[in-house]
């Protein structure tokens, strides 16, 4: 072979070796390594962690390491770390001489960089492997800075048992972050990777103590610590058995284990607030458990940032009980009445309702659905704001029927209710009473956006990064009346907060689901939104499970401990919302009795600010000019119940009924289909017809399909058993006034609907 050929071969060999050397390290170091799921609060404090899939406590890689550990590990493992290029010939020579003198291997001479390579490769500790590690170490030094190599070492070094990395070791052995370790604690951990199996804390304590103390004396000799540091460090005890990691917001930690496993997640949680609120819910959990109510969830949201500051998925998670592991804050639950403010605000915004519009509160049957108020009573007519504050069900159903279930469902979805995935037909009118299921997290965030929307500038709604992007409730006037109505809700302790300056003002709403299975309380101020759910995770009801009596007190306890913020702008000050002086609204004359726009028959009027669309609403339909006098006349069905609660109401007694209805069917509704169950003996159950007459003393004569069936006086109710099919009931009073209603009877063979 010629000299030129040999030269080419050498060149190719050198080039090949250079290429091999350049690519000898994997592109991503420690790829495929399983890490623990780590969750921290907004300031980086550990909320909790979950062990890696391989059973190791190995936190995700850190970018930097504490200065004390950096000093300690360099002093103990590789004093010349800052000077060498991955391999220290002096250390290798010293180790070789020492091993020969001892007659066995006493030191390996590996640098920190070589140890990182060994951790990466996981090969046996042989001479050949050490040579490979030396080559790879030089390449590692070319790729990364000294700080990065130290961070890799600190993240992957073994610290005994199933503990890997300085962060996990600091928490497992000392129950604190690595940055807070003392010199004695840091030195203890620094000597562990050298022989983790032999000096695992709790096993060979004497050997561990000797190694730690030698390192401390060495650092003192080299000027790393002073005499005081040395004296204090030598007096520190060794760690005992491994400690449990923090368990703050454990349901939130579990959520991140499922959604972001093996990663480090920094949340918006304030750990100090979290601990306080956890203590509140734990205390109430002890109280409620005595009456068969075992679970509580609570969420606190910062109104202006939309951040979740505290997240209690379930109280007392360490207390072993069925359902303790269920994250209620993210579990869809029946909403009860908690969604009513969104309907009230939406209708105000669209001009389909005025703040105090009188709404019917009378028995209704809407396609077989007959809503009932919580107290089983009827007011006849009630202002819309009062109906919201008192959480009356019948007016709410009337409002939803008028607004439309599909429209309201779209509003709720745009407000952030992510669990309402079924059609409007599926929910029906019961949507406003708990026929749908939402999560506490979604509901609390939606309430916070009501507060934020009122305080936000109009341009905020166009910002895609804003929590208000796509939020449908924007009208300042509608939002103000909604918040104002909600602050009138009675508190659980029956105290009038307006008389006590130290009690925080809160706009809040409760909800209780059918069967007393879910109790809600969600409140909002200009600063915070707080949501609380109380019940049993497994779904069983309890007699005392009512929102105002259970979730309400918990919510107010949380509000009372939240820190106040400085608020002083055009929408909020001194902890409460200011009446709007800016915005697209109008001033209009409103009837104080009916809540409608004042009409020509109204005796007086109030000048109110209203959303601009309110001008399309109808004028007062109840004030009439009769014989030259302005008279307030309710429909008979509303009047019957209204005058029982309003003795000042003077019922209208016309001489004839040419212009005003003198009687009205309360039940059934004209054209309705009535589903009645078949009894056990095969017969069909009867129904009770209900009529309101302006003159209760009047005699009413009842006819079913033109056949006389009876008469009533004072209380105009009559039970009949019509056959399946279409029918007409006609009533005639003793003055000759008549009224008819048509309906259809259908038999429900399954026993009801």
Cite the ranges covered by each PLM segment.
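Soluble, non-transmembrane domains of envelope/secretory-pathway proteins that act on or interact
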Residues: 3, 14, 506-753
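Short pre-catalytic segments that frame enzyme active sites
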Residues: 45-58, 168, 197-201, 254-261, ...
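Surface-exposed patches in mature extracellular/periplasmic domains of secreted proteins
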Residues: 81-90, 128, 150, 225-231, ...
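Glycine-rich, acidic and aromatic/proline-enriched surface loops and short helix-turn segments
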Residues: 115-122, 155-162, 179, 183-195, ...
